[in-house]
Amino acid sequence: MRVRVRLFASLREAAGVPEASLELPPGATAEGAWGRLVGDFPALAPRRASLAAAVNRRYAAFDTALQDGDEVVFIPPVSGG
């Protein structure tokens, strides 16, 4: 199955791309998508502990199963004032 991953803020800067298309096995989870993304963009690896995930514009746990065509967004912490 294929999913689209969108990257924002520090994740986009670390990967050097705004999005990626990933081929994943059936039953893959958001965690699996993150692992595949880190395989393609190793600079992302240290950022996992502070991320949230969203699937199809809804916050989702990292163990959420993905479907073909899903859009996955990994969200870094937001700060500012």
Named regions from a protein language model:
Residues M1-G80:
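Ubiquitin-like/PB1-type beta-grasp interaction modules and other compact soluble beta-rich domains
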